[in-house]
Amino acid sequence: MLIPYDQLEPDTLTRLIEDFVTREGTDNGDETPLQTRVLRVRHALTKGQAVIFFDLESQQCQLMLKHDVPKEFFE
């Protein structure tokens, strides 16, 4: 299930993005400040390049690139 980013409380969205950008394996040695990485993800969400995907089975939210989400979720 896709969750529109603008329907989340601002603090919830920020925490979700911060969790994503600080996960092991997402920085690839990049020493870009946290705030910059958060802004990049927020920009990708507003441009429609990334989406918030809620997996019903695992009950987890994930940030994903739009092209990585199965097409049936956009129908």
From Swiss-Prot:
Cited HAMAP family: UPF0270
Family listed: Belongs to the UPF0270 family.
Pfam families in alphabetical order: UPF0270 (PF06794)
Name used for this protein in its record: UPF0270 protein PSPPH_1506
Source species of the chain: Pseudomonas savastanoi pv. phaseolicola (strain 1448A / Race 6) (Pseudomonas syringae pv. phaseolicola (strain 1448A / Race 6))
Cited InterPro entries: UPF0270, YehU-like_sf
